Every structure is written in C-alpha cells, then in structure tokens.
C-alpha cells in the first residue's frame, strides 16, 4: 500500500490536465478518442451524454456523499478496496488490467480520487482521462509520453507502507 504524505498533498490540488468549467465543453474533444473516467459524476455525465467511457473508476460517492446512478452492467466489474489518501496494490493492478481490457468498471470500496495517477501510467497513448475537480469542473488529461512521465513523477510522491499482520502486531 502507498500513502500520500501531507507534504505532497498540495501537488494534487492542481489539475493534472486541462480544466473545463462545464461538461458540455469537454464533449467536443471526445469524438474518436478512447475515454477513461475517474469519479461518479463524470462517469454519470458521460453515460447521460451517450458517450460511455471505455474504463470507469467509481466509488459510489461524490464529495464524500453517497451518489447513486453509475451502472454499466455489460462491462467487466472489478471490486477493490482503497482508503482515502492512498493507493492499494489492488487498485494499481486493477488500473493496469482495465487499461488493457476496455469495457471495465473498477468499483472502489473507499475512495477513488487518486486513481487517476496509476490510470495515467497504464493508459495507452492517445487515451483521454476525465475526472472531476471539486468545485471547479472537469479535467481532461490527454495521455502523451510527457503526461505518462508526469504521472510516474507524481507516483513517486507516494510512500510505500506495510500493513502489519496480526502475528506481527502481537509478536506471535
């Protein structure tokens, strides 16, 4: 498991791509593109617009409040756990699998906000990733070699931590 230390959190408050203040503005950049989405509202907006993403990462919440309505039953469904402020190996692996097998929803039990980083690392060149920027709009991230490099740089901000086993905790 990897966690994002407090000293690096400010880096993740800035959009990692181009910020659009309305969803309608973003739609004109999507024809002919492979689209991945991170977040329930962005994914639901794509579905309502008749442009389902090839890969979606959702957690059933928006701004920490329950959010119903993201359901793509014909897609492969992956269920992973991921805490706020972190990236589990399961989530990282799921982004790699989904990026190579489109038609996948990653349902996160916990929080999916930081999943854009490993998703950008694994997404094919030319893919567009959309995610919400709370209170501001939608971020469009075009996957280029430079963006992949930036995602890898951001990934190094996370510190690997080990979760002790019960035997380690109790010295058994």
Swiss-Prot record:
Pfam families according to UniProt: DUF359 (PF04019)
One GO-annotated biological process of the protein: coenzyme A biosynthetic process
Q: What is a single molecular function from GO for this protein?
A: kinase activity
Q: Which InterPro entries match?
A: GTP-dep_dephospho-CoA_kin
Q: What are the entry keywords?
A: Coenzyme A biosynthesis, GTP-binding, Kinase, Nucleotide-binding, Transferase
Reaction catalyzed: 3'-dephospho-CoA + GTP = GDP + CoA + H(+)
Q: Locate the transmembrane regions by residue number.
A: none
Question: Can you tell me which residues bind GTP?
Answer: 40-42, 59, 112
Q: What class of enzyme is it?
A: transferase
Pathway this chain belongs to: Cofactor biosynthesis; coenzyme A biosynthesis
Its EC number is: 2.7.1.237
Task: Determine the domain of life of the protein's source.
Answer: Archaea
UniProt keyword Transferase present: yes
What the entry lists under HAMAP family is as follows: Dephospho_CoA_kinase_GTP_dep
Role according to the record: Catalyzes the GTP-dependent phosphorylation of the 3'-hydroxyl group of dephosphocoenzyme A to form coenzyme A (CoA).
State the similarity comment. Answer: Belongs to the GTP-dependent DPCK family.
What protein am I looking at? GTP-dependent dephospho-CoA kinase
């Amino acid at each position: 498991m990897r966690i994002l230390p407090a000293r690096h959190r400010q880096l993740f408050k800035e959009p990692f791509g181009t910020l659009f203040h309305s969803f309608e503005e973003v739609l004109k950049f999507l024809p002919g593109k492979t689209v991945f989405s991170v977040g329930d509202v962005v994914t639901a907006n794509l579905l309502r617009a008749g442009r389902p993403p090839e890969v979606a990462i959702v957690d059933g919440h928006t701004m920490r409040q329950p959010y119903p309505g993201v359901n793509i039953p014909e897609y492969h469904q992956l269920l992973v756990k991921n805490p706020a402020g972190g990236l589990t190996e399961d989530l990282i692996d799921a982004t790699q699998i989904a990026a190579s097998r489109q038609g996948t929803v990653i349902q996160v039990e916990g929080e999916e906000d930081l999943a854009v980083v490993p998703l950008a690392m694994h997404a094919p060149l030319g893919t567009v990733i959309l995610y919400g920027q709370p209170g501001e709009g939608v971020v469009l991230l075009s996957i280029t070699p430079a963006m992949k490099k930036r995602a890898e740089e951001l990934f190094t901000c996370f510190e690997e931590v080990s979760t002790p086993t019960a035997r380690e905790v109790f010295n058994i």
